[in-house]
Regions:
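Chitinase-like catalytic core of GlcNAc-active glycosidases
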Residues: 2-138
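Well-ordered, non-membrane alpha-helical segments in soluble/globular domains
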Residues: 62-72, 95-104, 135-145, 177-183, ...
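A structural motif corresponding to the C-terminal end of an alpha-helix
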Residues: 76-81, 105-111, 146-154, 228-239
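A structural signal for short, well-ordered beta-strand segments and their strand-loop junctions
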Residues: 85-87, 112-117, 154-160, 240-243
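Active-site region of glycoside hydrolase catalytic domains
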Residues: 96-100, 104, 111-113, 123, ...
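Glycan-binding loop/region signatures in secreted carbohydrate-active enzymes
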Residues: 154-156, 160-228, 260-261, 265-272
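Acidic/aromatic/glycine-rich contiguous surface patches that form carbohydrate-binding/processing clefts
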Residues: 228-276
Length: 276
């Protein structure tokens, strides 16, 4: 059985918070800038080891991507990074070309590349990132379909702690995102009966609003995050992206903390953690 790899997307200023964890930092410090060229944020915090996260927001699509790809490879070499995560939310042709070039360059050098699912068709060696947040269907089925499409050893799961309020019926399948504070406030006011969906690996409840009618609220907690990890493991997935802000209060539950740091708090079904 493959050993799990947890990549923790985290800003440079918070790196000390995951010291001692059984995980690798994914440095939220890079973006595609004009040129395109590789731009780095994070000030004077030294970055070493783990992987780099490259944000594609703000890139205008202009310029040849070859020099940029060489800059990424060079940065990995200088910083001792084992790879890179492409955090692209738009399918611009230059970004697709960039992903394809990095896929080949990284494979030649034994580096790991992780790309969002919409960019999966651009790569043949890299791992493809699926989101754990679903509003319908089955997480297990989604992982199986991805394994058939990309290969079982090329699928990674992004653990996204989500909470959404859906008006019923919901023809688009999209709800209103809730912060943890908003979710807790709503649950404190409604005191709803909370249920668990095995297919989605998420908790949910329903309520009626005098003005807007029936609502369905789907949300995650530490226990559902662990459930998603276990479902993914059974599907042969061993690489997880777990953003620090989403898992910081359930890192022990996920097995990321050394025993000396583990503290068992109340079950997440009984209380939604505060914080934003």
């Amino acid at each position: 059985m493959a050993t799990d790899i947890f990549l923790i997307p985290i800003p440079p200023q918070q790196l000390r918070n995951i010291q001692g964890w059984s995980a690798q930092p994914a440095h939220l410090a890079y973006r595609v800038g004009r040129g395109p060229h590789l731009f780095r944020a994070g000030g004077s915090v030294p970055l070493r080891g783990g992987v780099m996260v490259v944000d594609g927001q703000g890139y205008d699509g202009a310029g040849p991507v070859g020099p940029f790809c060489q800059e990424v490879v060079s940065e990995c070499s200088v910083r001792g990074f084992s790879g890179a995560v492409l955090d692209f939310d738009r399918r611009l042709p230059p970004l697709e070309q960039l992903a394809g070039q990095l896929d080949r360059l990284f494979a030649q050098r034994g580096l790991a590349l992780y790309v969002p699912e919409p960019f999966g068709h651009c790569v043949s060696h890299s791992r493809v990132i699926l989101s754990s947040a679903l509003s319908g269907g089955s997480l297990s089925q989604r992982l199986e379909e991805a394994a058939e499409r990309f290969g079982r050893d090329r699928v990674a799961l992004s653990l996204e702690r989500s909470a959404e309020d859906f008006s019923l019926p919901s023809p688009t399948g999209s709800g209103t995102p809730l912060t943890r504070q908003q979710l807790r406030k709503q649950m404190d006011a409604l005191r709803p009966s909370v249920f668990f969906s095995r297919e989605l690996c998420a908790r949910y409840y329903t309520y009626m609003d005098r003005d807007t009618g029936a609502h369905f609220v789907l949300f995650d907690d530490g226990d559902t995050m662990l459930c998603k990890v276990e479902v993914a493991r059974r599907a042969g997935v061993s690489v997880f992206l777990a953003p620090y802000e989403d898992i910081r209060d359930c890192a022990g539950l996920l097995g990321l903390l050394p025993r000396s740091m583990q503290k068992r708090g109340p079950r997440a079904v009984d209380a939604v953690p505060a914080g934003e």
